[in-house]
Amino acid sequence: MNKRYLQKATQGKLLIIIFIVTLWGKAVSSANHHKAHHVRTGTCEVVALHRCCNKNKIEERSQTVKCSCFPGQVAGTTRAAPSCVDASIVEQKWWCHMQPCLEGEECKVLPDRKGWSCSSGNKVKTTRVTH
């Protein structure tokens, strides 16, 4: 009977240890998940980059961005970097008003108004907006 009591007590302790370790693991995982995806209000961060070349040897790049903008702002681009911009710029597709190009580059809205191009000399970078 004493041996059986020890086995039951050991099993109980083992279950409690497993339970505590499981809870601790979930708490740590949750804390890391929250830290990794928190973006300070008014800022944006790139969470994924994609880069490839098409058959015409034109380099294509895309990125996934997470932004936390203030009310009245949405995700946009300023000086070739993700940023929060006034929502009316995006709603009305006045892309060049958010100053998306680097200093010295000329901004032009694409004819279909679905993006913009930045040019300097014979180099042209085209950005198409997708949702």
Swiss-Prot record:
**Protein location:** Cytoplasm; Nucleus
On whether Signal is a keyword of this UniProt record, the answer is yes
State one Pfam family annotation: TAFA
Q: What is its main location?
A: cytoplasm
State the name under which the record lists this protein.
Chemokine-like protein TAFA-2
> What organism does this protein naturally occur in?
Mus musculus
Q: Please tell me in which tissues this protein is expressed.
A: Mainly expressed in different brain regions, including cortex, amygdala and hippocampus (at protein level). Expressed by neurons and astrocytes.
Could you say which protein family the record assigns here? Belongs to the TAFA family.
Q: Which purpose does this protein serve, as stated in its record? A: Has a role as neurotrophic factor involved in neuronal survival and neurobiological functions.
Outcome of gene disruption: Mutant mice grow and develop normally but exhibit impairments in spatial learning and memory and impairments in short- and long-term memory, accompanied with increased level of anxiety-like behaviors in open-field test. They also show decreased level of depression-like behaviors in forced-swim test and tail-suspension test. They show neuronal loss, defects in dendritic and synaptic morphology, and apoptosis in the brain.
Q: Which residues belong to the signal peptide in this entry? A: 1-30
UniProt GO cellular component terms? cytoplasm; nucleus
User: Which GO terms fall under biological process for this protein?
Assistant: memory; visual learning
